[in-house]
Regions:
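Compact, charge-rich alpha-helical regulatory domains located at protein termini
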Residues: 1-24
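PLP-dependent enzyme catalytic core of the Aspartate aminotransferase-like
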Residues: 3, 105, 361, 403-436
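Flexible, glycine-rich loop/tail regions that form catalytic "lids" or insertion modules at the edges
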Residues: 26-27, 43, 64-65, 344, ...
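Short loop-beta-helix segment that forms the pyridoxal 5′-phosphate
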Residues: 54, 88-92, 109-128
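Conserved PLP-enzyme active-site core in the AAT-like
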Residues: 95, 125-295, 363, 367, ...
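Active-site C-terminal subdomain of aminotransferase-like
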Residues: 257-362, 366-369
Length: 436
């Protein structure tokens, strides 16, 4: 091999690496393994992890454990779809492009907007791309107002995307400590003629259903763009669509639609907007057309916006879309149907309120008064210690908020989905009270 590549010694391959960075001691590598030994080793390593089935889980905060129908897994495992190849070229199969078109259609129906793209990396990147899209629409404005009730990792991603843009000022809008919703009076004070956009969770990071319609009104009076962000996509099966409330761009995380919680990913970002702004959208768009024989077909459209056509002037540098995840969401939504999705969303709401009632019966009080979807905040003494004690009893009690929200010391975010049962609420109460 060395002779073939034209070097005399193996060390020649690392000659460019400084001596101080090279390992001098012998590397203790185990002997080679056959396939069965590798499988046993990897299985043993995996067994050291704790999975969702090992606990009663009330964790949420941006990723949610919902039931994934077997049909979704079967469809996404088909060889026609399960491939590492990104379908971005003109010769992408009609099956793939039709699936993406159907996904886009479903997202527009959920968001109440006219156009959606083929998908984004995740909800956080979709939110950041929405801000950049707003900047392209209103290039002379430079203030981005983000509600503090937006998920902290979404805020961090937006900051990263904007860090090199010196003409953009990112400001945080405080929240009402009584309701857990965005402080509208504070937003009014920020709504000047430099306001580019507002970014609001719907529901927000506390599970609270924000008064999105009123936020949109304040935003539009300033001539700015309203961006709605939904991390728990199931909520869109029950809540009034962001577009119907006047939002200009709606983004979110579609993981709840047929994807498991697996080390926090993969996710499925979605973005939808009004048709008048379609040329400023990031990512890929699939459109419906007809071939020379009049047969219906699907193709990538408005491709000149994209980086594989015009790299320097592209609307985004999204180098791939999450087509397989989009397929899972499409299959899931098709299986559920409009009525099924609404019933499941309502079931989540009912379970969450039952869980809160059980906690209130044990003297644990809700932190906020505003309506919520399927997660809520309660106040407990020493959430860190309480969560650790609950975990020892096989219960993942929720997410402590103080690390990201110091003013919510004692706040615990509890998430409830159809994977929880009412018997679990008793275990949660006992675990937090140190019983059982």
């Amino acid at each position: 091999m060395l002779e073939t590549i034209g070097v005399a010694h193996l060390e020649d391959l690392v000659a460019h690496v400084p001596e101080k960075l090279r390992a001098t001691a012998a590397i203790n590598l185990a002997s080679s393994m056959d396939e069965a030994e590798v499988a046993a080793e990897v299985t043993a390593l995996a067994a050291r992890n704790s999975g969702a089935l090992d606990f009663v889980s009330f964790l949420g905060g941006g990723y949610y454990r919902h039931y994934v129908p077997a049909a979704v897994r079967a469809i996404t495992a088909r060889a026609e779809f399960a491939t590492s190849y990104t379908p971005y070229q003109a010769e992408a199969s009609q099956g793939t492009t039709q699936m993406i078109f159907e996904f886009q259609t479903l997202i527009t129906q959920l968001t109440g907007l006219e156009v959606a793209n083929a998908s984004m990396y995740d909800g956080a990147s979709a939110a950041a791309e929405a801000v950049l899209m707003a900047r392209r629409i209103l290039p002379k404005r430079g203030v981005v107002a983000i509600s503090r009730t937006l998920w902290p990792d979404y805020c961090a991603t937006i900051r990263t995307y904007l860090s090199a843009l010196t003409d953009i000022d990112l400001v945080e809008v405080p929240f009402d400590l009584a309701t857990g919703a965005t402080d509208l009076a504070a937003l009014e004070r920020l709504a000047g003629d430099r306001l580019l956009c507002t970014v609001t969770g719907y529901p927000n990071a506390f599970g609270v259903i924000e008064p999105l319609g009123r936020i949109v009104e304040v935003t539009h009076r300033a001539g700015a763009i309203s961006i709605s962000v939904t991390a728990e996509a199931l909520a869109l099966g029950l809540l009034k669509p962001p577009g119907a409330l006047g939002a200009d761009i709606a983004v979110g995380e579609g993981q709840s639609f047929g994807m498991a919680v697996e080390f926090g990913g993969p996710g499925l970002g979605f973005i939808a907007a009004r048709a008048q702004n379609v040329r400023q959208m990031p990512g890929r768009l699939v459109g419906q057309t007809h071939d020379p024989d009049g047969r219906r077909g699907f193709c990538l459209t408005l491709a000149a916006r994209e980086q594989h056509i015009r790299r320097e002037r592209a609307t985004s540098n999204i180098c791939t879309n999450h087509s397989l995840c989009a397929l899972a969401a499409t299959a899931y939504l098709a299986l559920m149907g409009r009525r099924g999705l609404r019933e499941l969303a309502a079931h989540n709401v009912a379970l969450a309120h039952d869980a809160l009632a059980a906690l209130e019966g044990a003297g644990i009080r809700p932190r906020f008064s505003a309506p919520f979807f399927n997660e809520f905040v309660v106040s407990i003494d020493n959430p860190g210690a309480s969560r650790a004690a609950a975990e020892r009893r096989g219960v993942l009690a929720g997410l402590a908020l103080a690390p990201d929200y110091p003013e919510l010391r004692g706040g615990l975010l509890v998430s409830v989905t159809e994977m929880n049962h009412r018997i679990h609420f008793t275990r949660l109460v006992e675990a937090l009270r140190g019983q059982g």
